[in-house]
């Protein structure tokens, strides 16, 4: 059987060796170039390929059309991925005739994602394993071919557990590869209800937070000990790395992080005590815990913890300027930032109905105003604040055809001023791009870094919003490249939830789809399905969206700098008609149903009669969220039906309270 292999790490070497022994014909191997900044403790796929005279490549982008075509020309019957670090696009997965298969270091569906071995140890698991499964566009979600369990011992570290998993992988492949070659393959779908997803780990994730239980901290130590960067804490500003530890169940009345004894070196935790068996001071040697204490001058009663200079810096709250704070995203984001306690929010908008509940909060400062008029106030606050979010825009489809020039003036021209102020004062801008920039893209899912942005002809005015946003994206990107602007672009995909638009805005046609449909139910008018409602969208709960946006603001390890990030839920894909049917069912079952008129039925309307001349629709809009998973460790969790129910309840409660309901 002819195969193409994507491989890295020891598991990659193991997979290639197993394929050769099973009689597979490896036509090409794709791997990664060694990272000089990485502690490479594992075998080299490139060296192994050289020893076996196998062609090996390390392309910058294996999903580039040129590489896809080269792989297609090889006509492989199967693809195998063994710890290859990049996602393969559907165009590659569709090439082999037998299928594409991945070897994942956990017992799927648990621990999908990155660094599963480290995460299992962090979480104190007693068992993990290895899974051979079909590859799909969604990471680690394909049907299972075979699995082999691995027991995790109390003294296992990431290195020893990796060795166990490698041996299990070898045994599993020796058993399954001959079957697969003979066509004897049995697939078991994954149970999505048991799925869990974990993102990549960074060295910063190794910080020891002493208020946690000692057992958790011990698990962290063994999860990231050598050859990984290690768990760490600080004595003042001096870093100490913990390479080996024990945990004790004994309790202490001392504050977490307090030194209880020097020899042995024991630290009070939120629950129990952690004993540092071996460690290393920054710039020092690997030594026993007692010697480490002496080198750092640690004595009983002292405290260790966060870096002292960082703690002083964090005493000042991060100042966030939100223009359009009263809008759907703005008011929900304000709530999340104030709940966190580490942020001071400055907001401007032409109204305050959605943020009145924050007035009086010591960390919320609101001014009523228009961004096209209050330019001096805006420039001053951009200079004053740390993070800028210009959320002001016209984002309702009917306005794209009804008021195209106003859309351009506000969405592009006014926001360009904000961008230039951020350049002038060297401020970080988090700019709301839009899923609309993808236009009529023909990809199965829209990728921030490779999908084409396809729009219609000039006489279709509805694209003025899309191209205004796209042009700003390009301007921001250029400022980042040429003048060092610190930016992140985020692209929301059909966020829904309470406080989305208003029924009044729906009455004049200036609202999103679900608000318009709810108005039809409240008023007892037919639900209008534009062009039959066949258009598909991926609906995202506002809570999921705001959590992702909050993590962009947090920007751990500066991961989001210079990035474009889709924020959507690809699993919540449905047509407008399907959404309307779910909405109707929830409306009929709602406790307030009797306050409103009978359902008036569905009415099919043409887009031209609803939106006017110049409208053109999009058949589907499905995001790739690989960037969000990788950069934010984020995964949407809320199903569409729950979101629809919450949105409906908000509007019905409001209608009853204000007396809008049917008499």
From Swiss-Prot:
Gene3D superfamilies: 3.40.50.12230, NAD(P)-binding Rossmann-like Domain. Disulfide bonds: none annotated. The record marks 140 as: Raises pKa of active site His. Keywords: Antibiotic resistance, Lipid A biosynthesis, Lipid biosynthesis, Lipid metabolism, Lipopolysaccharide biosynthesis, Multifunctional enzyme, NAD, Oxidoreductase, Transferase. The record marks 102 as: Transition state stabilizer. (6R)-10-formyltetrahydrofolate binds at residues 114, 136-140. InterPro entries: Arna-like_SDR_e, Bifun_polymyxin_resist_ArnA, Epimerase_deHydtase, Formyl_trans_C, Formyl_transf_N, Formyl_transf_N_sf, Formyl_transferase-like_C_sf, Lipid_A_modif_metabolic_enz. Pathway: Nucleotide-sugar biosynthesis; UDP-4-deoxy-4-formamido-beta-L-arabinose biosynthesis; UDP-4-deoxy-4-formamido-beta-L-arabinose from UDP-alpha-D-glucuronate: step 1/3; Nucleotide-sugar biosynthesis; UDP-4-deoxy-4-formamido-beta-L-arabinose biosynthesis; UDP-4-deoxy-4-formamido-beta-L-arabinose from UDP-alpha-D-glucuronate: step 3/3; Bacterial outer membrane biogenesis; lipopolysaccharide biosynthesis. In the N-terminal section; belongs to the Fmt family. UDP-L-Ara4N formyltransferase subfamily. This is Bifunctional polymyxin resistance protein ArnA. It comes from Aeromonas hydrophila subsp. hydrophila (strain ATCC 7966 / DSM 30187 / BCRC 13018 / CCUG 14551 / JCM 1027 / KCTC 2358 / NCIMB 9240 / NCTC 8049). The lineage of its organism: Bacteria, Pseudomonadati, Pseudomonadota, Gammaproteobacteria, Aeromonadales.
């Amino acid at each position: 059987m002819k195969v193409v292999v994507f491989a890295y790490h020891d598991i990659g070497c193991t997979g290639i060796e197993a394929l050769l022994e099973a009689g597979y014909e490896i036509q090409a191997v794709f791997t990664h170039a060694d990272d000089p900044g990485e502690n490479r403790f594992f075998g080299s796929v490139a060296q192994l390929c050289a020893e076996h005279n196998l062609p090996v490549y390390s392309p910058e982008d294996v999903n580039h059309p040129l590489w896809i075509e080269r792989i297609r020309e090889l006509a492989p019957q199967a693809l195998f991925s063994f710890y290859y670090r990049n996602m393969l696009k559907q165009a590659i997965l569709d090439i082999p005739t037998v299928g594409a298969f991945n070897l994942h270091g956990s017992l799927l569906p648990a621990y999908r994602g990155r660094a599963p071995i480290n995460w299992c140890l962090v979480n104190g698991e007693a068992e993990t394993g290895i899974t051979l499964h079909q590859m799909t566009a969604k990471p680690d979600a394909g049907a299972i071919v075979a699995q082999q369990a691995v027991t995790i011992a109390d003294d296992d570290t990431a290195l020893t557990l990796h060795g166990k998993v490698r041996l299990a992988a070898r045994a599993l492949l020796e058993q399954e590869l001959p079957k697969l070659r003979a066509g004897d393959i049995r697939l078991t779908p994954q149970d999505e209800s048991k799925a869990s997803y974990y993102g990549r780990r960074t060295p910063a994730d190794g910080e020891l937070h002493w208020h946690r239980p000692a057992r958790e901290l011990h698990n962290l130590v063994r999860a990231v000990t050598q050859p990984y960067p290690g768990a760490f804490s600080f004595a003042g500003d001096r870093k100490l790395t913990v390479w080996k530890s024990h945990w004790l169940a004994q309790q202490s009345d001392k504050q977490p992080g307090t030194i209880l004894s020097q020899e042995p070196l024991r630290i009070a935790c939120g629950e129990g005590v952690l004993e540092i068996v071996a460690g290393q001071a920054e710039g020092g040697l690997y030594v026993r815990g007692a010697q480490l204490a002496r080198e750092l001058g640690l004595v009983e009663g002292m405290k260790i913890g966060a870096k002292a200079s960082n703690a002083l810096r964090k005493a000042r709250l991060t100042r966030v300027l939100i223009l359009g704070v009263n809008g759907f995203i703005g008011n929900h984001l304000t709530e999340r930032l104030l709940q966190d306690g580490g942020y001071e929010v400055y907001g401007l908008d032409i109204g305050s109905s959605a943020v009145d509940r924050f007035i009086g909060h010591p960390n919320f400062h609101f001014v009523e105003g228009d961004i096209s008029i209050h330019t001096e106030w805006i420039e001053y606050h951009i200079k004053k604040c740390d993070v800028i979010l210009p959320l002001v825009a016209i984002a309702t489809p009917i306005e794209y055809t009804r008021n195209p020039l106003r859309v351009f003036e506000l969405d592009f021209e006014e926001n360009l001023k904000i961008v230039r102020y951020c350049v002038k004062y060297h401020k970080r801008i988090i700019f709301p791009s839009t899923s609309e920039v993808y236009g009529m893209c023909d990809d199965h899912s829209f990728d921030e870094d490779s999908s084409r942005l396809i729009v219609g002809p000039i006489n279709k005015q509805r694209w003025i919003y899309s191209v205004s946003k796209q042009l700003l994206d390009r301007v921001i990107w250029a400022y980042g490249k040429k003048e060092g602007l610190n930016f992140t672009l985020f692209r929301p995909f059909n966020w829904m939830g309470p406080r989305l638009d208003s029924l009044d805005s729906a009455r004049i046609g200036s609202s999103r789809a679900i608000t318009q449909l709810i108005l039809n139910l409240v008023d007892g008018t037919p639900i209008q399905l534009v062009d039959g409602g066949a258009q598909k969208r991926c609906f995202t709960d506002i809570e999921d969206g705001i959590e992702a946006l909050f993590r962009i603001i947090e920007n751990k390890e500066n991961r989001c700098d210079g990035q474009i990030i889709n924020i959507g839920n690809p699993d919540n894909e449905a047509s407008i008609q399907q959404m309307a049917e779910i909405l109707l069912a929830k409306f009929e079952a709602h406790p307030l149903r009797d306050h409103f008129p009978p359902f008036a039925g569905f009415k099919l309307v043409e887009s031209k009669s609803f939106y006017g001349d110049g409208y053109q629709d999009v058949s589907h809009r499905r995001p790739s969220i690989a960037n969000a998973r990788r950069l934010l460790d984020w995964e949407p969790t809320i199903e569409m039906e729950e979101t629809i129910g919450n949105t409906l309840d908000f509007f019905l409660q409001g209608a009853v309270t204000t007396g809008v309901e049917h008499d």
